[in-house]
Amino acid sequence: MMKRILLLLLTAATIFCSCSKQSSKKLNGEYHYRIGGAVTTQTTDGKNTEYEILIEYQFGTMKIISTDSKNKTLYISMSSAMKGTFSNFTATEKDGVITFKDAEIQVSTRLPGETSSGTMSKNTTKICVDGVGKRYGDELLFDLTAKGIITTKYPDPEKGIDVITDLKVISSSIKCEASKND
């Protein structure tokens, strides 16, 4: 009787361990993604002028590789050939939730009021984000939170030059949706 109970416990432990290792491996693969949103910022020059930086919707390829199944560490690579952006960062997965901190992503940005053919629409900006994502079948949905200082440039029509400035992040609303390629 005791041997049967022990065998049953070992079988259950094996099943649970194999399932927990599988979840991060199931995320492995290539996805196509769409990212967009807005970041509210404030100048750091003492005037505290607020700007809303729009993150233009961009589409691209996301690759996820499980690098350490024991610690459920993931390597994520995002690239957009149309916008010329590329980002790499690591994340962790626990109970189906993907989290990452201090990931530096490159996005195409512009200030409101500018046309899509204006200088800012072609500006590639690096933004530091924390993110939380969840898997729904073959879909991944991420909520990203921008933080820190964003260095960006914008055209100054009065001076006729591009101005480079640091902007402090106040708040953000950035979404990323990814669908697994077949």
Predicted features and spans:
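C-terminal motif of bacterial Sec signal peptides marking the signal peptidase cleavage site
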Residues: 15-18
